[in-house]
């Protein structure tokens, strides 16, 4: 692998696991072990393109962990406290406002058919 880019991707991945799983030590350690194993498995890639693909994939995984993984802690009863952080990507809920027919789901397709029958 390209040493400098690979080392940067490795460090970013470790940072991402710390952000995503900081309160869950077993999951944090498992994620870091998985990342290390992935780098060990790919350390002998000879093809430059394969190296770049592996590094880019790891960078994408790191971004996904940071932006999309939120740990939750069970509170009393059936309540959970979600540990959002400043880099968590929050949706704008625009899809919730769309009708099912506009979203293109199977239910929407049936709803569209049903509305055509009614006319």
Swiss-Prot record:
GO terms for molecular function: protein folding chaperone. Residues 1-14 form a transit peptide. Keywords: Chaperone, Mitochondrion, Transit peptide. Assembly factor required for Rieske Fe-S protein RIP1 incorporation into the cytochrome b-c1 (CIII) complex. Functions as a chaperone, binding to this subunit within the mitochondrial matrix and stabilizing it prior to its translocation and insertion into the late CIII dimeric intermediate within the mitochondrial inner membrane. Modulates the mitochondrial matrix zinc pool. Transmembrane segments: none annotated. Its main location: mitochondrion. This is Mitochondrial zinc maintenance protein 1, mitochondrial. GO terms for biological process: mitochondrial respiratory chain complex III assembly. It is found in: Mitochondrion matrix. GO terms for cellular component: mitochondrial matrix. Belongs to the complex I LYR family. MZM1 subfamily. The keyword Chaperone applies. It comes from the Eukaryota. Interacts with RIP1.
């Amino acid at each position: 692998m390209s040493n400098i880019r690979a080392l940067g991707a490795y460090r970013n991945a470790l940072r991402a696991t710390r952000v995503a799983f900081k309160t869950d030590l077993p999951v944090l350690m498992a994620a870091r072990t998985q990342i290390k194993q992935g780098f060990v498995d790919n350390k002998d890639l000879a093809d430059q393109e394969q190296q770049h693909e592996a590094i880019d994939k790891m960078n994408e995984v790191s971004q996904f962990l940071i932006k999309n993984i939120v740990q939750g802690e069970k509170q009393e009863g059936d309540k959970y406290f979600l540990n959002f952080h400043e880099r968590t990507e929050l949706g704008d809920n625009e899809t919730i406002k769309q009708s099912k027919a506009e979203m293109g789901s199977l239910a929407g397709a049936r709803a569209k058919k049903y509305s055509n029958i009614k006319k």
